[in-house]
Amino acid sequence: MENTRRLLLTLLLCGTSASAQVPDDDWDFEEGYRAQMLYLHALVNYAYDLEWQYEWERRQFADNSLRINTGSVASDKLLTDIDLNINQPLNEKWRFMGRFTRNGFRWRPVREDRLLVGLERSILDSSAVYLTVNPEFDKEFIDVAAGYTFYKDNREQYVRIGVLAEDFDWDIKNRFAGQQDQRAITVQWALRLSLANNWWLYSDGEVGSGFERTFPDPAESPDISRHDRRENMAQVRLTRRESDGKAWSAWISWYDFNELKEFRPPGFDYDYRNTVLNVAVEHTRIIGERHRLRLLAHYVDQQAESIGFNAHNYDRQDILGGVFYEYLWPMSGVTFAYALGQPDITYTAPDSTDNYDLDDYRDKLILGWRYTFSEDAQIRLSISHEVSAHGFGGGAVQFQMFF
């Protein structure tokens, strides 16, 4: 266990940075636009099971925790999400606090790797304050986060509210003589509260103003003259879990991204926005001693547009579903599943030859295997076959551990 903790604490030393450049026709923002199975992969085939999600929400601040979700989405693309939480007591008042998050390429325009490490101190019997930083190699990209948390029931109920100051020292440390007209200040929250009749309310998110930056000196910044970015996200979830293995969950998640860039070379300026709304329900139940049924449904609405470079409008709605049957043994189980997706995609641009509509029905047959190492660790392996597209549907590995 101690070796595991050392290994995962070492992982917290990872981080990334980003730099601006003139865009080209192979625009990352349009990654996934034509992928009719984009949401079928991410939200059905490779989604965390309701039981796993419930345990993660319950224990993410009570214990140290790690979960990894990786699955193939194309012959040359691998979707990988990582969440690592460290809540290590140091004495009666202090805890080491660390969080590493990687959001793989899904519907989001940019992949995110975020690291925050610091300390949490109890100030009353049921509350604490914290301060964390992102020890980025390039100092202009160091983030600072601080906040307050109210805890209850051994930290399994909580209300956490904080503020994240992104690129805290960017004005002084940036290498391009840039000026910041608006700092990126973000409100972050996470809460889990018990309601009546075994229902639980969970929510997390971060909402802020984003940054606005100008680069007045062409000698220091020969390509870009202005850069604004805002990225917000939130989710609300209601879950009910009973002792006989039945569970219900319904949730809404929202994601909004906006980036504006102005370049000194003509013809590259753009104002890009991407908004995704996802409404979902999930149900699981044990039938007898050996059988488990899991039902999942999503409705996704995505709206994106670019003004200027690569001007376009992107309108997408997906209806998704999955039926998962698991045959159970004491420490493991084998899953047979059918997943389906009906996308409705419309892409319009000033040049009508660039326009397209996609609405092909997509479905998968999935074979999976789960093994429970202990009440604190599980792994799932799966492979799938694309029925309507007549091809291999990808393999996936999911792992979740508390320590």
Task: Set out the residue ranges of the language-model regions.
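Outer-membrane beta-barrel initiation region
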Residues: 20-125
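Transmembrane beta-strands of outer-membrane beta-barrel pores
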Residues: 48-50, 70-74, 100-106, 133-139, ...
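Residue-level signature of outer-membrane beta-barrel architecture
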Residues: 86-88, 119-121, 148-152, 191-199, ...
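Repeated loop/turn-to-beta-strand initiation elements of outer-membrane beta-barrel proteins
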Residues: 92-98, 122-131, 153-160, 196-203, ...
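Outer-membrane beta-barrel proteins
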Residues: 107-110, 140-143, 157, 168-174, ...
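Outer membrane beta-barrel transmembrane domains
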Residues: 220-222, 260-269, 294-296, 303-382, ...
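Outer-membrane beta-barrel "beta-signal"
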Residues: 365-367, 391-403
